[in-house]
Amino acid sequence: MTHDDDKLRPLDRQLQLDDIPNIDLYMDQVIQLFERTFEATTRTEGETILTKTMINNYAKKKLFFPVTNKKYTKNHLILISLIYQLKGTVSINDIKATLTELNQGVANETLNLEAFYASYLENTVRNLETFEAEQASADENEPIDQLQQILSLAHMSNLYRRAAERMIDQLDG
């Protein structure tokens, strides 16, 4: 991995299964865990990663199954991590549509969320490797080249977001 690749790593922090305690956590502990995990991904110092209001809104909108005794299980933390990843790209309603089947599977005990999340994490590693390879070939020495790269990344981001939105629309029927 080159020095440039080292700069890209913080862009893709993920909450790893090993990072999640095997005990249920209170909301403040959940927030601390997410702040420690995703702090390196923030654009500016003091940027908010996760707040009580956000978590309460996710619960109110039923983005994850209900908590018991104000404690969040490992499955809740996995779902909140997925919400965190999705919220920068798609709307809350789209997140709900995306996670509905997952939540039902967890609630009905027909889905192993940890195995699903492990598979997701494997996909993120492959995605990062592809991204790093593409970025390594980009020449960003001249301002005009940087502008071209910025525009290209924004365009790719829009394409991926639109593709995700189409898939979400197909989930809705």
Residue ranges: model-predicted function:
Residues 1-103:
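Basic helix-turn-helix/winged-helix DNA-binding cores
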